[in-house]
């Protein structure tokens, strides 16, 4: 299938490489011409993914119009750019094209809503949105380290299309979920627990304290998630 990946940061490049590995026709977009020129010339991003070579088969462009012909559009832009990028996409992609957001967090510019809500609002609700989220590091995905992730959406068809695009039999397992609220909130709230776990380490409190903090933190995430509509 044709996949258009918006964003050439570490995560965007890693996912573009995975999709290319899976046999898809992949285009990566950046809004910076100098970055586009550098990636064309060097075929790598030494700052974010040192030693990782971007395959020649991945097209790199500053022209977003190619998204109009894509079966799947992947949003891998910084969180502050999600809304503005989705607004541009709304003028380009046809209705029903699946939009996959791979960022985590909440949209502080729009009342701390979930990013799937931000995208859906920007695109007038005409496109199914998938949250692709999980315990993942870009550099490990780029190097083919075994990884598991979840594609969550209110649209089962959109989640399964995303699963089919990203999953392979060697190193990338994709599960599907209808609980997009829970998946997005979990991806955002876990950062708070991660900070607390780091503080525990810094204070030298040991494994017992950190384990207790993480366990109770997971319980709080689940309780708060349910209050906010998660399953």
Residues covered by each model-derived region:
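Hydrophobic/aromatic beta-strand patches that form the interior of the parallel beta-sheet core
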Residues: 27-29, 61, 74, 100, ...
């Amino acid at each position: 299938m044709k996949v258009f990946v918006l964003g050439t940061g570490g995560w965007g490049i890693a996912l573009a490489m995975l999709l290319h590995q899976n046999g898809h026709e992949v285009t990566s977009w950046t809004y910076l011409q100098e970055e586009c020129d550098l990636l064309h010339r060097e075929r790598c991003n030494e700052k974010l993914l040192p030693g990782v070579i971007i395959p020649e088969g991945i097209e790199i462009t500053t022209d977003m119009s190619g998204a109009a012909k894509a079966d799947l559009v992947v949003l891998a832009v910084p969180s502050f750019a999600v809304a503005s990028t989705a607004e541009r996409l709304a003028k380009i992609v046809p209705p029903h094209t699946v939009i996959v957001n791979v960022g985590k967090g909440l949209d502080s510019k729009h009342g701390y809503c979930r990013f799937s809500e931000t995208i859906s609002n920007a695109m007038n609700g005409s496109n199914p949105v998938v949250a692709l989220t999980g315990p993942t590091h870009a550099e490990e995905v780029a190097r083919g380290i075994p990884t598991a992730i979840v594609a969550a959406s209110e649209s089962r068809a959109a989640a399964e299309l995303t699963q089919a695009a990203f999953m392979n039999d060697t190193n990338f397992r994709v599960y599907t979920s209808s609980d997009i609220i829970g998946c997005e909130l979990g991806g955002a709230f876990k950062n708070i627990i991660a900070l607390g776990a780091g503080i525990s380490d810094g204070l030298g409190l040991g494994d017992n304290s950190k384990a207790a903090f993480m366990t109770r933190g997971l319980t709080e995430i689940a309780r708060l998630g349910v209050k906010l509509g998660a399953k």
